[in-house]
Structures are given as structure tokens and as C-alpha cells.
Amino acid sequence: QKTIVRNREKLYNDLLELSALSDDFKVYNSCANFVFVKTSFGKELWNYLKDNSIVIRFMGDYIRISVGTEEENEELISCIKTYLSR
């Protein structure tokens, strides 16, 4: 459980850093094993990540990102950074 909390906090902080790349990418922390992001391009990001073998949950104006291993989270952050930098 401590690993999940640590990985969630790192994922949240990494996503917060990425939010500087887009005004339409608001990150919300949680006490569970996921992080919410509010964005109008959630469907496009969901498809982009799916094409890169990363699965997140698309929920209309939000996406839900489950906490993974440190390596999985790093790959996710790298893909989102690439997407936001296009």
C-alpha cells in the first residue's frame, strides 16, 4: 500500500508538471489508486495512449488514470508529454 501511495503522489506531481503544457489539462489528486484529469481532449488522448499500448479510462470531460508501477507511470508520462507537445 505504501508503494501505491508513493507512486500515486509521484504520478500526480508529474501530471501537474505536464499541466503547464496545456491550459486544458487540470489534474485532481485522490486518496484512491487513481488520478483524475479534466480536459476537453480526453477522447483524443485516450486514443493516442491506446495506440501506444497504455489504457486509461475515458469519462467524458475527465480521464481516470490508475496508478501503475514506477516504470508504467514513467511510460505514461512520457507519452502524455509527447502528445501535449505536438
Regions found by a protein language model. Give the residues of each.
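Conserved PLP-dependent catalytic core of the aminotransferase class-I/II
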Residues: 1-26
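Short beta-strand
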Residues: 26-30, 56-58
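A short, structure-level motif marking secondary-structure boundaries and short turns
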Residues: 29-32, 73
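Conserved beta/loop motifs at nucleotide-recognition and modification sites
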Residues: 35
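PLP-dependent enzyme catalytic core of the Aspartate aminotransferase-like
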Residues: 43, 48-57, 61-86
